Amino acid sequence: MAVSAIIVGLGNPGPRYAATRHNFGFMVLDALMERARQLGGAPKATLTGRKDLEAVTLSLPVLPGGAFAQFACVKPLTFMNLSGRAVRAALDFYKLAPTDVFVLHDELDLPLGRMRLKRGGGNAGHNGLKSINQELGSPEFVRLRLGIGRPEGRDVAGYVLEAFRGDETPVVRQVVPAAVDGIMAFFEDGLETAQRRVGGFDAVPPPLPQP
């Protein structure tokens, strides 16, 4: 079965960053892999031995009649600012186009508890997206934007590398499975249907601490 798309979770490697806001994409990708296991499309390691990425293939029942399609799920291990190199390597290996890439990433311009789905567009200051755009030579990949909120009067670079606060954790736990539902909806029903599903989700976040 040929891989039909590459799903990329953005984040930084290593336990130090595992629970940080910048690793929201990794969190959702992990949940997608668990969903695949539950549905009978267990992930299998691929592209083994590489130092720039981790990758698995998995199957999801998103075709008519509940038939399975195969996807590659990729975590860049290059650190955020060089994510595009890993995505380019996976794209070349599977001989797919930039339009076959689906990226999961944290989004400062949305509050925690909200998501948006789109194809193409700018990078909104996100260095991972900037790197992917540069390496692929095209912005026409799909992005699932996972809101983390923008802090007032604080350094953004430090904020994204902090772990979610304890009072934010219940919201994160709601967002992650809803994001997986959105991914499934995209591959099952297309962009517009998935946009409505993702855009209609709203988990109320706690207020941001004042500086």
UniProtKB/Swiss-Prot annotation:
<comment type="similarity">
    <text>Belongs to the PTH family.</text>
</comment>
<feature type="binding site">
    <location>
        <position position="79"/>
    </location>
    <ligand>
        <name>tRNA</name>
    </ligand>
</feature>
<dbReference type="InterPro" id="IPR036416">
    <property type="entry name" value="Pept_tRNA_hydro_sf"/>
</dbReference>
<feature type="binding site">
    <location>
        <position position="81"/>
    </location>
    <ligand>
        <name>tRNA</name>
    </ligand>
</feature>
<protein>
    <recommendedName>
        <fullName>Peptidyl-tRNA hydrolase</fullName>
        <ecNumber>3.1.1.29</ecNumber>
    </recommendedName>
</protein>
<dbReference type="GO" id="GO:0005737">
    <property type="term" value="C:cytoplasm"/>
</dbReference>
<comment type="function">
    <text>Catalyzes the release of premature peptidyl moieties from peptidyl-tRNA molecules trapped in stalled 50S ribosomal subunits, and thus maintains levels of free tRNAs and 50S ribosomes.</text>
</comment>
<keyword id="KW-0963">Cytoplasm</keyword>
<keyword id="KW-0694">RNA-binding</keyword>
<dbReference type="GO" id="GO:0072344">
    <property type="term" value="P:rescue of stalled ribosome"/>
</dbReference>
<comment type="function">
    <text>Hydrolyzes ribosome-free peptidyl-tRNAs (with 1 or more amino acids incorporated), which drop off the ribosome during protein synthesis, or as a result of ribosome stalling.</text>
</comment>
<feature type="binding site">
    <location>
        <position position="17"/>
    </location>
    <ligand>
        <name>tRNA</name>
    </ligand>
</feature>
<dbReference type="InterPro" id="IPR001328">
    <property type="entry name" value="Pept_tRNA_hydro"/>
</dbReference>
<feature type="binding site">
    <location>
        <position position="127"/>
    </location>
    <ligand>
        <name>tRNA</name>
    </ligand>
</feature>
<dbReference type="InterPro" id="IPR018171">
    <property type="entry name" value="Pept_tRNA_hydro_CS"/>
</dbReference>
<dbReference type="GO" id="GO:0004045">
    <property type="term" value="F:peptidyl-tRNA hydrolase activity"/>
</dbReference>
<feature type="active site" description="Proton acceptor">
    <location>
        <position position="22"/>
    </location>
</feature>
<dbReference type="GO" id="GO:0006515">
    <property type="term" value="P:protein quality control for misfolded or incompletely synthesized proteins"/>
</dbReference>
<dbReference type="GO" id="GO:0000049">
    <property type="term" value="F:tRNA binding"/>
</dbReference>
<dbReference type="Pfam" id="PF01195">
    <property type="entry name" value="Pept_tRNA_hydro"/>
</dbReference>
<feature type="site" description="Discriminates between blocked and unblocked aminoacyl-tRNA">
    <location>
        <position position="12"/>
    </location>
</feature>
<keyword id="KW-0378">Hydrolase</keyword>
<comment type="subunit">
    <text>Monomer.</text>
</comment>
<keyword id="KW-0820">tRNA-binding</keyword>
<feature type="site" description="Stabilizes the basic form of H active site to accept a proton">
    <location>
        <position position="106"/>
    </location>
</feature>
